[in-house]
Structures are given as structure tokens and as C-alpha cells.
């Protein structure tokens, strides 16, 4: 054959199937543009000039590039397999007319090559053209003000070309195998082959229910933030497996159950809808499950990142209790704490700043093992000590507790305490080591704030620092060099603008360093200094990076979801066209056909979004605890962000439904009346 003929055939085939290839090409270009943009921003030299958080932002953007690359493989393979199924009849005709499979392979290679050049080239042009705009958007989100210089990331271009050229090459190899293994007759009928009625897979349905229930159980019953972080990905995997298995096996079981109910099944609209869904449910189920999982990802990613960014002020307030924070770990807390406080106050006055509010707090925190309601001081590697049994006991003076937590505590005598816990401690006394204390009052606080990493915290309020001494000595004797010391923290709010507060904080740090206190006395104490205004930039940059990534990934997942829905509707339309023509011939009116179509499409479309909403609601407690690790304890804010995300996504989803419904009707030869 003439070599030029292969190229003409490839171009004509793409034009002839433009209703399939145009969405594929456009979304491929967008995916390429997204991937390049992430690499461009990650390698942007301007980010290296960030005073704080440059590593955090670059890490977030690098993670985004990996995620986009991973889903690009899945997305391009899915759409390619759909298009190839629709084109098998066309390729079969070429084969019958005399083209050998090696000739078909050359045509498909050129088609893949042209599509790859269009997607990669167009995507890179779009990515480069809008790179400066994306950089401006990122800088705005992270609160960074700097001149943006236009440049092309050579490493980003090379990495993008290599990745997507590899993906398109893999799709070509997949298509080649499909042609080589198929017979001419199979190619002729490939696009019209429906799914055989699947068998009821009871084991798969049971496994799906069990795994989904297990994932829900983990998400709902998790009781501390670190466990939530550890179990999150396990729960996600279980829910994904459960979703696919239930859609593929459970849905078939339900449809067959409905078919057995003669009073329900033998009605025109139910008969056609149920029998049609059963006939090809295996193919539908995988697509519906994919739509459900992608919808869930959109809801979780966008709601989480938006709430993190919107709650930044709350997170900073929880993390930093003052403009300047100074803490000292010491064996002589009163003497060294007073000296530190005097030095900090003197330095602030020298900087001509006024103290608006000052709060100091002395605590002693050490771990114990809970045994029958008693707290035993014992090393954690001893036999019988488990993480779930560890209690972090935090002792605090009555005066500091009232001032810090704005609560009232009654007068305490010797061996009397106030106990604050997140659980229901029901005893009137508490024994710690060899010491027993009467509980004068019990207080309860939110379990969200009641954990030290993955262990529970008990706050034990005593009259004075001297009342902490017996337990300080007891834990020191047991833990030796790993024993806890007294911890004195000082938080001060000062007047002035941001720059003045940063300068004052730096002056305090310099004064402590010059005094020699920072080095400690024979290593017996350690000082930590925090400057809220200075560290705020780092938080804003990190959370702004997360928001930017969340929006990018949300758009990507939404785009993939829309394309899967679009191709699914086209596939359904072609498969149903002949079937509904037969239904009209056997007596169904045009109106009855339209009602049947609408009922079936509504069921197919609503099932994924409803299931996705259930997934997100079940995951709410776990996600909220994960956000608590990042100091976002405003559950109401997260709930509002989640509700808003669900609302906006549902509106977009319904618009896609309306658009694809029209496409479906055009294919089957009906108009929406």
C-alpha cells in the first residue's frame, strides 16, 4: 500500500470519529497542561526566595504532579478503550476489504501519533501560555508578593513529553493486542456486542458489604487524630473495594430480586429499565463505581483544602497563644521561669512595645500506664504496656488552669485535685504511682483536644508547683534520663504592626541568646522561642499550597468524571438505539419509550452521587480528626465547607446529566419533548 494512504486514512478516521476524539483530545490537552503547570511551579525559582515554607510548598506541588500523572494513565486508558470498542466495526470493514492487520496497525499507530502530538503539543502550549497566570494565582493564595518573570521550564517540558508519550505508546500497544487477537467477524460486531447477563455473585456482594462496612466503621468510630491518620488510607482502600464490589455484584442481586417480584417487574417502564440494566450491568457497574469514587474524591479534596485555608486564623490561634511564645524545660521551674519572664518583659520594653496580655503556665507532663483505674509509672517497654493503655498525665497549678482555660476551680487542700478528662472517669480518687489523691471536682473536655498524639490526656489540677514535686521525683526515679522536666511557657500579646511584632520577637530571641540562658545550665534546661507573626507566613504558604493543589485536583477529577459520564451515555445510546426501536414496533408509544429512558438514566446518574455523599458523610469524623492534627478544630467550618462543596458539585453534576441526556436522545433518535 502507498505510504501516504496510511496517513490519509488516519486523519480521515479521526475526523469521522470526531464526536469521540474531540473530547478525548481536549481533555488530554488539559491533563498535559495541568501536569506541566505543576512541574513549572515546582521548579519555579521564585519559590526558592520564599522566606519561610518554600520546602512545604514545593513538596505539595511535587505531590500534585505525581497524583496528576497517576490519574492521567487511568483516564487515558479508560477513554481509549471506550473509543476502540466503538471503532471495532469500522476496523473490521477495513479488514474484510483487504487490509491486513499489519496495515491496520500502521493506521492506528499514526492515529495515536497524531493524537499524542495534538494533546502533548496543545497541552504544553496552553500550560506555557497560562503559566504566569497560574503562578500569580499560587502567589496570591500563599500570600507571597514578588515579581513574576516569564520563563519556560525545560525540565518540565521534557518530563511532560516523556510521561505522556509513554502513556500514548501504551495505549497503542493495547489497541494493537486488541486487533491482533480479534477475528474479522469479531471486529465487525465488536461495537454492538452487549454484556451477557451476569450471574449473581453472592460472594463478591458479601465481600463488598463487609469491606464497605469495615471502612465506614473505621471512619465513624476512630477516637483520636493520629489513629485517624494511620487508618485513613486503609479505610479509603476498603471503601473503594466495597464500592466496586457492591456496584458490580450487589446491584445485580438487587435487580434480579426486583425481576422476581412479578407485580413490580411486569410493568412496561420497570420491565424495560430493569431488564436493560441487568443485561449490561457488569459494564455499567464499573463505570458507575468509578464515577462514585471520583465524585467522592472531588468532595473530600476541595472541602478539606478550602476549610483548612478558611480556618487559618483559628489554626494559628490554636497553635500560637500569643504574639511571642517562650517556653523553658527545667528542673528548677520557679527560679529559671521568673528569670526568663523578667528578661522577656525587659526586652519588649526596650523595643518600645506595650504588653497587651501576658499569660504564664507551669506544667509537668509524663506518661503512665492505666491499670484498673490507677495510673502506674512504668517504662513503656515493660511487659503488659500497650499504646491504648498509656495516659499522658499533665499536672498544672490551680491558678494557671483557671487563667489558661477560663474555668473556675474550687480551693484545694493537700492531696485534693481537680481531674479533667475526655472520658468518663467514675472514681472519687485517683492513684498515681504510690500517691492517692481525692478528686474534689471532675471536668470534661472535648476528645478532639484530649489526646497527646495517640494517647489520652488527663489534666490533674493541684494547688501549687510544690504539690507536683512528689510525682516529679517518682517519675524521675523510674524513667531516669528519659524523665520529664517541668515545663514553663510564657505567651505575650504586644501592640504594633506585623513588622514591628516580628522585630520584637527577633529581639527577644537575640536577648535570650546573648544572656546565655539558651544554652542551659549543665544541660538541665532547654528554651524554645516562637514568633507568631513570622511563622504565620509559613502556615499561609503551606495551606495556600494545599488549597491550590486541592482546586487543581478537584478540577482534574471533575473533568475525568464528566468525560466518563459522557462516554458512558454515548455507549448507552448506541446500545439502546436498536432495542428501543424494537420496543416501539411491539407496541410501546413514543411517550412510553421516553419515560422508560428517563427512568433508567435517572437511576444510573443518581446512584453514584448519592453514594458519594454517603461516603463523605461517613468519613466526616475521620477527616475532621485529621484536620485537628493540623490545628483545625472548627468542626462547624468544615461542615459548612463540605455542605457547600456537595451543593456546588451536585449542581454541576445535574447540568452534566441534562447535557448528556440530550446527547443520549439524539443517538436513539428521540427528542426531549
Where are these regions (language model features)?
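Short helix-loop junctions at transmembrane helix boundaries
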Residues: 40-51, 55, 124-156, 213-231, ...
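Juxtamembrane interface at the cytosolic side of transmembrane helices
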Residues: 78, 86, 178, 224, ...
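Basic-flanked hydrophobic alpha-helices used for secretion and membrane insertion
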Residues: 315-329, 335-559
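N-terminal Sec/SRP start-transfer signal
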Residues: 1-32, 197-202, 211, 247-295, ...
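Hydrophobic alpha-helical transmembrane segments of multi-pass inner-membrane transport and secretion
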Residues: 19-46, 55-92, 113-126, 206, ...
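Short cytosolic juxtamembrane segments of multi-pass membrane proteins
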Residues: 3-8, 181-195, 574-575, 665-673
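Hydrophobic alpha-helical segments
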Residues: 114-258
Amino acid at each position: 500500500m502507498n505510504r501516504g494512504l496510511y496517513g490519509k486514512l488516519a486523519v480521515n478516521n479521526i475526523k469521522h470519529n470526531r464526536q469521540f476524539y474531540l473530547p478525548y483530545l481536549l481533555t488530554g490537552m488539559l491533563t498535559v497542561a495541568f501536569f506541566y503547570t505543576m512541574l513549572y511551579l515546582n521548579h519555579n525559582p521564585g519559590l526558592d526566595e520564599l522566606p519561610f515554607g518554600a520546602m512545604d510548598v514545593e513538596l505539595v506541588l511535587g505531590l500534585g504532579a505525581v497524583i496528576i500523572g497517576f490519574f492521567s494513565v487511568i483516564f487515558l486508558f479508560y477513554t481509549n478503550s471506550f473509543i476502540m470498542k466503538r471503532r471495532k466495526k469500522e476496523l473490521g470493514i477495513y479488514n474484510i476489504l483487504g487490509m491486513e492487520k499489519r496495515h491496520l496497525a500502521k493506521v492506528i499507530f499514526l492515529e495515536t501519533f497524531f493524537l499524542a502530538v495534538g494533546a502533548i503539543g496543545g497541552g504544553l502550549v496552553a500550560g506555557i501560555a497560562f503559566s504566569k497566570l497560574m503562578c500569580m494565582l499560587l502567589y496570591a493564595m500563599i500570600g507571597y508578593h514578588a515579581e513574576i518573570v516569564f520563563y519556560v521550564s525545560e525540565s518540565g517540558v521534557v518530563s511532560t513529553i516523556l510521561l505522556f508519550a509513554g502513556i500514548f505508546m501504551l495505549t497503542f500497544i493495547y489497541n494493537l493486542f486488541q486487533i491482533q487477537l480479534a477475528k474479522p467477524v469479531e471486529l465487525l460486531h465488536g461495537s454492538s456486542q452487549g454484556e451477557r447477563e451476569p450471574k449473581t455473585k453472592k460472594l463478591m456482594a458479601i465481600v463488598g458489604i463487609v469491606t464497605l462496612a469495615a471502612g465506614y466503621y473505621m471512619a465513624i468510630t476512630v477516637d483520636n487524630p493520629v489513629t485517624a491518620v494511620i487508618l485513613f488510607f486503609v479505610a479509603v482502600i476498603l471503601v473503594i473495594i466495597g464500592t466496586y464490589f457492591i456496584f458490580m455484584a450487589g446491584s445485580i442481586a438487587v435487580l434480579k430480586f426486583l425481576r422476581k417480584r412479578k407485580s413490580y417487574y411486569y410493568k412496561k417502564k420497570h420491565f424495560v429499565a430493569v431488564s436493560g440494566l441487568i443485561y449490561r450491568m457488569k459494564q455499567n457497574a464499573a463505570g458507575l463505581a468509578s464515577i462514585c469514587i471520583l465524585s467522592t474524591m472531588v468532595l473530600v479534596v476541595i472541602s478539606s483544602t478550602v476549610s483548612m485555608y478558611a480556618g487559618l486564623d483559628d489554626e494559628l490561634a490554636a497553635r500560637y497563644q500569643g504574639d511571642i511564645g517562650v517556653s523553658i524545660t527545667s528542673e528548677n521551674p520557679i527560679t529559671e521561669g521568673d528569670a526568663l519572664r523578667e528578661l522577656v518583659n525587659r526586652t519588649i520594653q526596650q523595643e518600645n512595645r506595650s504588653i497587651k496580655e501576658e499569660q504564664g503556665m507551669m506544667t509537668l507532663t509524663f506518661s503512665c500506664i492505666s491499670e484498673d483505674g490507677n495510673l502506674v509509672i512504668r517504662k513503656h517497654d515493660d511487659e503488659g504496656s500497650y499504646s491504648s493503655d498509656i495516659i499522658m498525665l499533665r499536672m498544672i497549678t490551680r491558678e494557671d488552669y483557671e487563667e489558661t482555660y477560663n474555668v473556675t476551680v474550687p480551693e484545694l487542700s493537700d492531696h485534693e485535685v481537680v481531674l479533667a478528662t475526655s472520658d468518663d472517669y467514675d472514681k472519687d480518687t485517683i492513684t498515681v504511682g504510690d500517691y492517692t489523691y481525692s478528686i474534689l471536682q471532675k471536668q470534661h473536655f472535648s476528645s478532639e483536644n484530649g489526646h497527646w498524639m495517640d494517647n489520652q490526656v488527663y489534666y490533674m489540677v493541684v494547688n501549687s508547683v510544690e504539690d507536683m514535686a512528689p510525682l516529679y521525683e517518682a517519675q524521675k526515679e523510674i524513667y531516669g534520663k528519659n524523665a520529664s522536666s517541668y515545663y514553663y511557657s510564657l505567651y505575650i500579646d504586644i501592640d504594633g504592626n506585623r513588622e514591628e511584632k516580628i522585630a520584637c520577637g527577633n529581639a527577644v530571641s537575640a536577648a535570650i541568646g546573648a544572656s546565655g540562658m539558651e544554652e542551659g545550665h549543665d544541660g538541665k534546661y532547654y528554651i524554645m522561642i516562637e514568633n507568631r507573626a513570622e511563622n504565620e507566613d509559613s502556615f499561609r504558604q503551606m495551606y495556600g499550597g494545599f488549597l491550590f493543589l486541592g482546586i487543581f485536583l478537584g478540577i482534574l477529577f471533575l473533568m475525568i468524571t464528566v468525560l466518563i459520564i459522557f462516554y458512558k451515555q454515548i455507549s448507552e445510546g448506541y446500545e439502546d438505539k436498536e432495542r428501543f426501536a424494537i420496543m416501539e414496533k411491539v407496541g410501546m408509544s413514543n411517550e412510553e419509550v421516553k419515560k422508560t429512558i428517563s427512568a433508567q438514566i435517572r437511576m444510573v446518574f443518581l446512584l453514584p452521587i448519592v453514594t458519594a455523599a454517603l461516603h463523605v458523610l461517613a468519613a466526616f469524623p475521620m477527616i475532621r480528626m485529621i484536620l485537628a492534627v493540623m490545628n483545625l478544630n472548627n468542626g462547624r467550618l468544615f461542615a459548612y465547607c463540605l455542605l457547600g462543596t456537595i451543593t456546588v458539585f451536585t449542581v454541576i453534576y445535574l447540568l452534566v446529566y441534562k447535557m448528556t441526556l440530550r446527547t443520549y436522545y439524539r443517538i436513539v433518535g428521540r427528542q426531549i419533548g
